[in-house]
Curated annotation (Swiss-Prot):
CDD domains, per database record: UBA_EF-Ts (cd14275)
Taxonomic lineage of the native organism: Bacteria, Pseudomonadati, Pseudomonadota, Gammaproteobacteria, Aeromonadales
Ranges that cross the membrane: none
Keyword Cytoplasm: yes
NCBIfam families, sorted: tsf (TIGR00116)
Protein family (similarity comment): Belongs to the EF-Ts family.
Protein name stated in the entry: Elongation factor Ts
Keywords associated with the record: Cytoplasm, Elongation factor, Protein biosynthesis
Record-linked SUPFAM superfamilies: Elongation factor Ts (EF-Ts), dimerisation domain, UBA-like
One Gene Ontology MF term: translation elongation factor activity
GO cellular component terms attached to this protein's record: cytoplasm
Primary site of residence: cytoplasm
Region Involved in Mg(2+) ion dislocation from EF-Tu: start-end pairs: 80-83
Protein biosynthesis is among the record's keywords: yes
């Protein structure tokens, strides 16, 4: 067996960020050849990362980038908020957003296949960081919007918005992106609210009125007024502007000679069922697994 020195173990730890015992074992198996040890660890690290893929990555960060008339937003997930704040994770996420913007990539699979700039794909770069940190990660989605007046806003790394305007200023586009982040409208304008959503809300409001003791015909008349208020509340242009509630967004747009074409809002983990762990059961399972080993 080759003589594995403390200096070799230290160098391997620095180059791989793996644990001391893992590094010592890898060097012993590679007969002291550090390059072979790294190659073997990368192979086993990727296999180890693949095993983690079943774990739920419901934390993460929203990254945004504007490049000329292109705005891009991505969601990169991790299992814990701690890893989402890691410098390597943050740098990788911003680089992926930059790649999507400069290469105009609007598809997740295409973005995963893109060159990260280090001779490896985006997907492999993510996999390598999974192996290094020991926690599952996932490039969940990407949105690309093209237009002459685009606004992006990211709040606390967890909520991101892209707005697309005709007319107006870049500042207005960003202000409206901030508004969407804060107020979470579902539609651009009241007339965009789908018939299905309106019908469902009308039914709910009629039931509320009837249950309060109103006759059905009176209840139906009351609800018509409420429905107009409802469609305004769930649409961007019908809401009071977040920076000046004395005017609606529609009034602001008229004043600025602008219109909103679209908006996209991402929030970290939305739609992902987060796994709730019974800590006592998890510890018991780990002890049982250790006893079997």
């Amino acid at each position: 067996m080759a003589n594995v020195t403390a200096a070799l173990v230290k160098e391997l730890r620095e180059r791989t960020a793996a644990g001391m015992m893992d590094c010592k074992k890898a060097l012993e198996e590679a007969a002291g050849d550090i390059e072979l040890a790294i190659e073997n660890m990368r192979k086993s690290g990727q296999a180890k990362a693949a095993k983690k893929a079943g774990r739920i990555a419901a934390e993460g960060v929203i990254f945004a980038r504007t490049e000329g008339n292109v705005a891009v937003m991505i969601e990169l997930n991790s299992e814990t908020d701690f890893v989402a704040k890691d410098a390597s994770f943050m740098a990788m996420g911003q680089k992926i957003a930059d790649i999507a913007a400069t290469q105009k990539i609007a598809d997740v699979d295409a973005l995963k296949a893109a060159d990260f700039g280090n001779g490896e794909s985006v997907e492999l770069t993510i996999t390598n960081l999974i192996a290094k940190i020991g926690e599952n990660m996932n490039l969940r989605r990407v949105m690309l919007v093209e237009g002459d007046n685009l606004g992006t806003y990211v709040h606390g790394s967890r909520i991101g918005v892209i707005t697309k305007l005709t007319g107006g200023t870049a500042e207005l586009a960003k202000d409206l992106a901030m508004h969407v982040a804060a107020n979470s409208p579902q539609f651009v304008k009241p007339e965009d609210v789908s018939a299905e959503v309106v019908a469902k809300e009308r039914e709910i409001q009629i039931d509320i009125a009837i249950n309060s003791g109103k006759p059905k015909d009176i209840a139906e008349k009351m609800v018509e007024g409420r429905m107009k208020k409802f469609t305004g509340e769930v649409s961007l242009t019908g809401q009071p502007f977040v920076k000046d509630p004395s005017m609606t967004v529609a009034e602001l747009l008229k004043k600025e000679g602008a219109d909103v074409v679209s908006f996209t809002r991402f929030e970290v983990g939305e739609g992902i069922e987060k796994q709730e762990t019974d800590f006592a059961a998890e510890v018991a399972a780990q002890i049982a697994a250790a006893q079997k080993a």
